[in-house]
Amino acid sequence: MNENEFSTNSLINQQGTNNNNNNNTNNNITNINFGTENNNNSPIINNNNNNNNNNNNNINIVESPPLVIRQQQLFNNFQQLNTPPTTPNTSTPSTPTSSRNNNNNNNNNIDFYNSKFLPPKPKSLNNSGNYLNNNNNINNNNNNNNNNHHNNNNNNNNNINFTNLSNSGNSLKFNKNMSDITNDNSNSSSNAGSNSKLSNSNGCSNLLTSSFNNILNSTNVQVVSGNNNYHNGNNENGNNTFHVGNNLNNNNNNNNIGSSGGNNSHHHHNHSHHNSGNHQNGGSNGQPLSYSYDNLFNNLYADIQHPHQYLSNHSGNNINNTSQSNNNNNNNNNNNNNNNNNNNNNNNNSNNNNNNNSNNNNNNNNNNNNNNNNNNNNNSNNSNSNNTNNSNSNHNNNNNHNNNNNNNNNNSNNNNIHGNSNNNNNNNHGSSYVTPSSDISSPSPPSSTSMASIVSSPPVQVSPLQSPASHLSPMSPSNNFGGNHNNYNHAHHSHHNNHAHHNTHNYNNNNNNNNNNNNNNNNNNNNSNNSNNNSNTNNNGNNGNNSNNNNNHPMSHIDAFNKVTQLTSTTSTSIPKKLKRDYEQTFSKDEWEDYTPPSKYFQLFSYSKSEMSGSFSFKVKRTDKNIQYSELDSAWILYRQNRFQVDCDLIGSLESWSNLDRNNTIFVNSNNNNNNNNNNNNNNDNGDLSEVNGLFFTLYVLKFTDANNIQSSNDQNDRVPIHQLGGATGKKDRLTVEPSPVVKGRGCWNKLQFGSATSNNARVHPDQPNPNQQFFRVVITLNAVIDKNFENQNFTTPQFYPIQSKISPPMIVRGQNPGRFLNHDKSLKKDPNSSPNGGKGGGGSGSGGMGGGMGGGMGNNGSSGSSSNGGYGNGSANKHMKTFLNTSNSDNSDDDQSPTTTTTTTTTTTTPTPTPTTTTTTTNETTTSTIPTTTPLPKTPSPTLTAPSITTTLDGNNTSIFNGPCDLTTIDPLTFSNLLQDPLILGQTMMVDIDSNNILNNINTNSTINNNNNNNNTNSDDLMVYDPQTTLDLANLIQQQQLHQQQQLSNLKAAQAAAAIAASIANTTSTPNTTSTDIQNPFNFLNNPLTNTNIQQSLFLNQNIPGVSTNQMINSLNLANGLLQNTTTPQSHHTILEINNNHHHHQQQQQQPITTTTTTTTTIPSTPQPSQQSMTNSGGSSSTNSSISRKNKFAKWNTNPFMEEVIYTNNKVGINTTTPTQALAVNGNILVTGELFKPSDQRIKSNIRLDNTDHWDKINRLKIYDYDRKKMMGYDDPNNNGTTQESTTVKEKGFLAQEVKEVLPNAVKVAGEVKLQDGTTVPNLLVVNDRVLLLENIGATQQIGRSLKKEKDHIVKIDRDLDRVKIEGSREKHVILTRMQDMVNFMHSEESERSNNNNEESCVYCSLMGFGPAWTMFVFGFFIPICWIIGSFYLFSPTRVKWVSGLMNFVATIIFILALSLMTFYVPELAALIIAPALIVMGFVVCILVGFFRQRNREKKRYLRERIKLMQADGYKNLADHVSSFRVDYNQHQAKANNNMLKKKKKRIQMEKLNSQRNYGGINTTDKINNSNINNIGINNPNNIQNNQINNILNNSNNNINNNNQERLSDSSKSSFIDDFKKSSSNNHKDFHEIPLQEIIQSIGIKGKKQSSSSAKTRSLSSSNLVNSVNSNLVNSTNSNNTSILLKSHNSNSPLFNSTPTPTNVVFNSIEV
């Protein structure tokens, strides 16, 4: 089909669609498809009458024909919009009258969308290698349309918008002549001028050719019509594009963008000249572009062949997608000065129109004001009606409609055009993508939306030179750009192929598979709510959903524009497998890819309910020390025991997310179902959003058979076990890999280890990879958790909602290191009997059902067995063994393993009359085989035995454990003991299938082989089993049993034991499964049916089984013993094998084609000896049987017929004693290196009660004695351990059983009668159970501990009380001292105030905190600045306080002078107005501060006065009297001290002597006491002086003092008293602090003894000493040079304030002056 036909079809389809749209909608957007010459009669504008309602005619040119026709049609149509309608010509029909209405509205926008007159332009590159994103560019187009609409409504602009002209994705609005059509915001000229200029232009051809050159050179520039303020010289991002010159950037506020100087002329040549030079020469001026069409293409693609020029030309001008989007917002702000609401709509595209089906169309919808909202709803109805016609793409078309930002009607109609052609592929194009013209036969470049997700997704490094095979390349098969349509042959001549190509080109999951498309479509509904993220304006929103696969388009796509290059990609299945792949052509070695599992995925939404798809992602880093990369396999190789670490880092908007410290709120569409597309296509809401409480990373491993495949049909079934090493003790415990919480955007797992290895690791050819090689890939998934109890302890069942997943490169995991794969098995190192030339074969290991892993054998020739579910085994067989079983032999080592097909080999028991019980075993390839596993055997005279069988199962790590039938008779005892010690085996079921009549003849063995798994899990050390091909050397066994015949005959009881075994097990065949416990349990044997107590007891019962002779039973038992004793060292003899062909044929009919079944029956004949035959001939008399029974009754030791290492007896065992009374009696010491165990499980106990008895009392009542114990017969050696050499007693220490029985009755038992060595007999000997004593001792210890704890608590409490008492005592002392100190300080302050006559209260004595008058000058200086000068003289004061105040005055003076000078110099007229108020304000502030501190001082003094009053009321009642008396006495003394003091002193002494002689009869001490100059202060409480004489003296002295006080008060003046007191008491506070307080501290708290001693000493004082002390104090006080009051005591035992604490007050005993 040629291009004309193509355009014609497109035109017809679009016209029909426009009719439907007009019928269903009131849309303002008209779709015009300019036809070619063959279609000139076709109407261009259809049903434009509906557009009159919205007054907006936007002519969108889609898929326009070649250049010349389009230019003419463009010109004609533009004239029709701006001029009255004329007669329609042949080329273009007349425009309906609604176009005139459009002219009245003065808003005529012609948008050229993806037109063909220009070829596509390659994407420009930024420096980081990332291509420019079409997301913001498309948004720019929408914003520009919106801006133009609003500006047109206001400014009468007619705009011709060229969008995606060069397919670069960057929107451009180009104006005719760059300024003629476009008017500035301030310009309100009519359209006539614009139309006339347009009509007067040199034709549309000249317009286009001249303007397109400029367009080519400025394609990526965001040029906004009507307002060019955005391009103020330089854009915000610098030189945004590769084609923009300086002239364009220098268009500052110029309407004429094409000119270089801002003039309005049509200087297209200058513009293109500079731009082309900048484009071609990296900034230098070059030659202008030619106007010819061919030269346009040549110049356009001149630098395509040299992509490095882009990078070099713009090495500093990286274009940021986000900044471009911001620039567009700036465009909106510049152009829509009066349309702020519409700008808000552009910013919130996802929030304002959630109910509309085309939320991404908000930009254009806003162009048409409120009517566009109605159009949105109608558009969705139109899409539905079209969907009815195209049932194959109903919902997909609707989804396309939702994401068509530019033109809702146009896009939905275009979808319907291609709806039938490509079915579900219609999801991929909302508007058809336009290819270059027909002269370029090259594939189309990726569409604008194919990179729309780069903005919303993190940047990914893309190499420009990546090959199509790269996983990062859109052409890579792994990216699935086209699903089933991965072809890049651009079919310009085929309508369907053209659009189908773009569909497959742009999207990843747009297959013809409805399921895939449904997932994409539903994501479209979710993604369509956020146009900024998806920005799928011209294409379907699937690009937003599949942004991970469409992020990057390397430079290799540039070759798609070449005429020669044609790329064809195929699916991954059709690519031939390369034997050796070039690593650099595939992908990075540790590059984690995006993974899309088959499970449901969810979307995150921000706090504003806008979708966050693409705004975040995460990267994964794996760390491993011993990992290597294989170039041949294109995979990493490591070993299973290797440990590695995986780190996950969130990037983007969730980079700093932490579960416990969430900075923002996000939501997840928890209830949105991606599979129900038919119901959700018309619903654009976000589903039921739930708040995300946390983010978690989860990790699991998948297995793949193809290294290039990352898709798993069911990843749940393809998962591989992985565990994490660690544990509470730091050991290598295998822990479950738990989800990793996101902390600061990070998650981590360390010490990870694979639970199994990959299969088919061996290479078929050394230089070629194994085609069946299995690969492991680690999958990391980011999950959202919406559990409300996330931060609580109830967070047990989190709800994980997967968001994104990453998958690792392929890995090959080997089971062992290469050095460990030797010819000999590791188990040979443990077995001392093994050797390279013989011995036991290596034990096989493996997994799977029905005996998987039971491989191996005896001897040297290796054979292996495997199971249908992955079991395998390696071992060695006997050299001389004749093998009749054709079992698959393979060496399944990890590094040398060939690809094999799963084979099942089954060996079962054959019977003449089988009634099989079938079991189904499923292989990895879902191959099943039905085989009989348990067949009852008929009763025959020859007894046979079918050994217990073990079934192997597969655990989580592909470890082989027994879970199926196998022959225990072919297992050596050492191996079988190892099997029983394996917890994996003991944890599974052991089946016993033994018939009462068939004891040894049949050997039932089931073994399966699987060659797919490697020898990964080395459990062969413990699972040393033999190959079923290996047979027993029966002749050797018969020889050896003849050697033991004599011993066997003496033990005929064994025959009865065998019969008892058969009978007991036959009774238990209905429940043959018993579960054994861990081998670490010392009582494990109790639960084993082979060692059951009932079986042991039945071994020695005298039972005669009818039908079976005694000789037969003996022979059977001998054979059994011989088998078990000789399997370890078999010899080469003839092998007897019987193959039951009938049963073999019966099982072959039931098997699958890949399953083989073989039945083997080994018959062991009995060879009776002569002694046995004689017994048989005699018929076995009853007397013989009775003698045998009597002999076997006292048989000492027996061997377990099933476990050779077990010996037992039913008799009592005595060690160093001949008469044991218990099961084990030991006479002597017991040395135990292990542990002694006793059953103590709660599950076997009942009636459990806590023993609350007084254990301590019981233990305390027990008494320990030293005694001599008499020796007992059979227990004690008569020659040892005696007190003497021949003594019959033994020295011991212990309890007496009788006393113990009274205290602990349950600790004493009766042992029976005991005979002593001295000949006496003790009946009912009492023995003591030491365990009971031990338990009582433990209880007593616990009781003591509880008592000690109580005592400890009591001691702590007492200690706390003692500390409290000490603290309270210290507090009391502190209170007393504080009171006295306050009293002394207050007394001194009161006297100071009186002496100063309250000078402090006067304002002249204004002092800040008592500093003096200098601070007064400082304060007054704020009101009178000259005071600062006066106060500055205090700098010369030697006093520190005054010097500081003087310094402050000086500083204030300097500052004032400087401020005054500056203000006068600069603002002399305002200097006074500023300085004067400032000084006054500062002065008031200083006054307030001074007043505040002064008030504080007054408050403190007031507080002290109040406190002294309280002190007086609380013990200091006479304090004021004492103080006043002291002052009067001191003043009187000072007044008379200077007048003949000695005379008066002598006279007073004489008078006192006379008075004393008269009153006291010879006491000479009254002379000094009666001295008038002596002033004594009365003592209120003279407890320390009990002498009556001294009391009288003190009373007389008090009377004299009172009388003298009255006289002195009348004589003295107040002023003289104040002066004298001030001089004398200036240093009193020092004495109060230094001397009295120290003595008071020493005397406080001393009671009793100190009082009594002080009283005795006081009574011994003589009055002469008292008078002498008073006189000495008086002399010192009268010293004129040292006028001070010395407060001293008359001796060391009488302090100044000797306070004797009383309940009410504190009394001063004496104060001496």
UniProtKB/Swiss-Prot annotation:
Residue spans of biased composition, Basic residues class: 265-276, 490-504
Transmembrane portions of the chain: 1416-1436, 1447-1467, 1473-1493
Chain segments carrying region Disordered: 1-35, 79-200, 226-290, 309-557, 713-734, 808-952, 1143-1190, 1596-1634, 1646-1665
Compositionally biased tracts (Gly residues): 838-874
Positions with biased composition (Low complexity): 13-35, 79-109, 126-170, 177-200, 226-264, 317-470, 478-489, 505-553, 898-946, 1148-1189, 1596-1605
Keyword tags: DNA-binding, Membrane, Transmembrane, Transmembrane helix
Any one Gene Ontology BP term: positive regulation of DNA-templated transcription
UniProt keyword Electron transport, yes or no: no
Peptidase S74 domain: residues covered: 1240-1355
DNA-binding region coordinates: 544-825
Annotated Basic and acidic residues bias: 822-832, 1617-1634
Protein's membrane topology: Multi-pass membrane protein
InterPro entries: MRF-like, NDT80_DNA-bd_dom, p53-like_TF_DNA-bd_sf, S74_ICA
Site (Cleavage): P1239, S1240
Domain of life assignment: Eukaryota
Keyword Cell inner membrane recorded: no
Record Pfam families: Peptidase_S74
Record localization: Membrane
Main subcellular localisation: membrane
GO CC terms in record: endoplasmic reticulum membrane; nucleus
Entry's Gene Ontology molecular function annotations: DNA-binding transcription factor activity; sequence-specific DNA binding
Comp. bias (Polar residues): 1-12
Entry protein name: Uncharacterized membrane protein DDB_G0293934
